[in-house]
Amino acid sequence: MAGHRMARMAEEIKRELARLLRDEMKDPRLGFVSITAVEVSGDGRHAKVYVSVMGDESARDNSQAALKQATGFLRTELSKSLRVRYVPELVFLSDLSIERGTRIARLLTEMENHDDAEAPR
């Protein structure tokens, strides 16, 4: 039962943070950020927020710095929409899975093109 409640809270946090980043954040360091997952601890006091940032490593670093600085603002805004006693402490972590998936897809396409070029006609 508690696991289901934490999963529901994680999904609600993910949805609300995505809205806040899209509509409320005005920090120019914040690039194109997608929230890929949220994990809430069993007691609901801590949440790991996994973000994917489009761009190079400096864009990722700038976005991480902007998110870290905005953590207090984001928690305050979450407290207005979440119906919980304690709003979790937010920790933003880079999620490189989308970037890795794109790289693998590109490598597979290159291999396929290379095989087509070498095939006898």
UniProtKB/Swiss-Prot annotation:
What coarse category fits the chief subcellular location reported for this protein?
Answer: cytoplasm
Q: Which GO terms describe its molecular function?
A: ribosomal small subunit binding
One GO BP on record is: maturation of SSU-rRNA
User: What is a single cellular component term in the Gene Ontology annotation?
Assistant: cytosol
SUPFAM superfamilies from the entry?
A: Ribosome-binding factor A, RbfA
PROSITE patterns linked to this entry: RBFA
Annotated localization: Cytoplasm
Q: State the UniProt keywords alphabetically.
A: Cytoplasm, Ribosome biogenesis
Main function: One of several proteins that assist in the late maturation steps of the functional core of the 30S ribosomal subunit. Associates with free 30S ribosomal subunits (but not with 30S subunits that are part of 70S ribosomes or polysomes). Required for efficient processing of 16S rRNA. May interact with the 5'-terminal helix region of 16S rRNA.
Q: What's the subunit arrangement here?
A: Monomer. Binds 30S ribosomal subunits, but not 50S ribosomal subunits or 70S ribosomes.
Q: Which family does it belong to?
A: Belongs to the RbfA family.
| Record's protein name | Ribosome-binding factor A
Species whose genome carries this gene: Heliobacterium modesticaldum (strain ATCC 51547 / Ice1)
